[in-house]
């Protein structure tokens, strides 16, 4: 059945999909009928253990009963008002209570919108035009982000997307991740409005900051009066309730959030210092608006998700699953005659074959992508779904029980022994 739908999709959608990475599953994407817990159920009758989890939002797994209950309760009250609602206050209070940089908040509808607005805010606040980003960091699908980006941009060998004016390209400076010398060189010009960074890279596989990198960014941006923006769309509420900034104890000026704070529904947010956030309309002159901003349905899902994270051992379960799977993958790969490395933090990890250390995007691009795809395809046949792209992240959730983890480990041992 998936094959028939794929043929229709090719007639209806550009490239057959509505987000490029979905086309990376070969020979055609499988189509999902329903999801629950750690499982996807395809229209072809296959049950898959899911380690993609919507590319990050579903830290509690699919269709969590409490989140579902709160979504249904809100649907019965209406799902779009066009006015403020109590729910936006409740979710904002939860975010502010946990995220150290979140003095004020503006909700939007995606991570892309959030980073686009954060960049605009940095430029409006500093009256400078240039932005510094890092090679392989993915900040969504807008013009200022699609320059040396990660994720599907790298998968399809696109360094700079077509359609971006040269005038915009010239305002974006790119440094290697973990390279503070490059950052200081460009900040010294005092032309940089802001530095935007994934504190943990999640769209070139998983790449961790070296020991002094984030602290170095904090000190340099203070010295040269640039805005430090942490893109925590992935790491926010995944590395813990306080995100990467709490985990690494480095507080940025602005933070972008998304994914988990919407409980699986579309969301984004910009949070940060009052003096910067006050530049947003209607208080200031940096414009932002949105029909669906802070819609009550997404707010309800986000509140429910954070409530579960606050009151249960969800993080412990998700982190344990990630640790055990990564360790057993390491055991299997160590028996093979090739170099490899596994980068992991909390409930997110990725493995790279053919290279022994990955600290930036250039390293990640040297990995054996063909062998990664073979492992993905063999695991899929055994009912385990990891990302089809080397440049995505393997996520775990609180729905990945010991039994599910053990089934996954069995599949990994079998697949790795055969490659």
Swiss-Prot record:
Its cofactor is pyridoxal 5'-phosphate. GO terms for cellular component: cytoplasm. InterPro entries: 4pyrrol_synth_GluAld_NH2Trfase, Aminotrans_3, Aminotrans_3_PPA_site, PyrdxlP-dep_Trfase, PyrdxlP-dep_Trfase_major, PyrdxlP-dep_Trfase_small. The keyword Cytoplasm applies. Pathway: Porphyrin-containing compound metabolism; protoporphyrin-IX biosynthesis; 5-aminolevulinate from L-glutamyl-tRNA(Glu): step 2/2. It is an enzyme of class 5 (isomerase). GO terms for biological process: protoporphyrinogen IX biosynthetic process. The keyword Cytoplasm applies. It is found in: Cytoplasm. Its main location: cytoplasm. NCBIfam families: hemL, PRK00062.1. This is Glutamate-1-semialdehyde 2,1-aminomutase. It comes from Sulfurisphaera tokodaii (strain DSM 16993 / JCM 10545 / NBRC 100140 / 7) (Sulfolobus tokodaii).
